[in-house]
Regions:
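C-terminal substrate-binding/catalytic lobe of Rossmann-fold NAD(P)-dependent oxidoreductases
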Residues: 2, 6, 10-43, 124-251
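Rossmann-fold NAD(P) dinucleotide-binding segment
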Residues: 40-42, 46, 52-75, 84-87
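Hydrophobic beta-strand scaffold residues
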Residues: 26, 72-73, 97-98
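Rossmann-fold dehydrogenase core element
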Residues: 86-105, 122-132
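Short, ordered loop/turn segments at secondary-structure junctions
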Residues: 32, 77-79, 103-104, 135-137
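Rossmann-fold NAD(P)-binding glycine/threonine-rich loop
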Residues: 76-98, 109, 114-117
Length: 251
């Protein structure tokens, strides 16, 4: 398969390594200093472009790739609030293909399934209050993380007593602290901590007077995310439309 990379930071380098190990060809690498290469024959020859950039660049990158009818796999977060409807329209009506996920880790896909199941169980146990915490490296710009938001939305869909998520306690990269996990009964607080070079930790806790249940996904490195992105690209080559991890992993 011919792959184009959009974004060549730590994730881009890791994706390149795994893609080559799996027998794929990298035909184009686009970063901030060569945006004009979107219009190159090499980019247009790609079966799939894998995009990991930042919230401000992602949507424009999708548009540039779609202009050449190149399918996109993206793990960029933070753009959905402003552009979700337009991206959905481009895929459902415009014939384009985007595989988007807030997290491509196989472990997170499994964790997500456990999260949904546990939320359904907790409908029968109203004495448990739920909250979430995510910890990431100091370079991560958005908070809460896209993965935390996805997990929170799953809980809201399956746990009747919660209907919205809100920012909880915040510990910024510069050490400043703000916010609180003390929220209204219908709200799910997400605490965000920026610390050192942590790849990503997501914890969901159900607390009662008697005990506390916590489930956690702790990423040891970016390798799991990169492998998942390449697996998603392999899937996307053979499929069309708006895709996500529930299409790739059937559980």
């Amino acid at each position: 398969m011919k792959i184009a990379l959009i974004g060549y930071g730590k994730m881009g380098h890791m994706i390149e390594q795994i893609a080559l190990e799996r027998g794929h060809e990298i035909v184009s690498i686009i970063d901030v200093d060569n945006i004009e290469d979107f219009d190159s024959p090499a980019f247009a020859s790609a079966d799939v472009a894998i995009e990991f950039t930042n919230p401000t660049a992602a949507f424009a990158n999708y548009q540039r790739a779609f202009a050449h009818n190149v399918k996109v796999v993206s793990g960029s977060t933070g753009w959905i609030q402003d552009h979700k409807a337009e991206v959905e329209r481009m895929c459902t009506e415009g014939g384009q293909t985007l595989f988007w996920a807030s997290n491509f880790s196989i472990g997170v896909a499994i964790f997500s399934a456990v999260n949904r199941y546990l939320a359904k169980i907790m409908n029968g146990f109203p004495q448990y209050s739920v909250e979430m915490e995510e910890v990431h490296h100091i370079h991560k710009l958005d908070a809460p993380s896209g993965t935390a938001i996805t997990l929170a939305e799953e809980i809201i869909n399956d746990l009747d007593r919660k209907d919205k998520w809100v920012k909880g306690f915040q510990h910024a990269a510069d050490g400043t602290e703000s916010g609180s996990n003390e929220v209204a009964p219908n709200e799910l607080p997400i605490a965000s901590i920026r610390r050192d070079e942590v790849p990503g930790i997501h914890s969901i806790s159900y607390d009662s007077e008697a005990d506390k249940i916590t489930i956690t996904h702790d990423a040891h490195s970016r390798k799991g995310f990169a492998l998942g992105a390449v697996l998603a690209a392999e899937y996307t080559k053979e499929h069309t439309g708006l895709l996500t991890t529930s299409d790739l992993f059937k559980f």
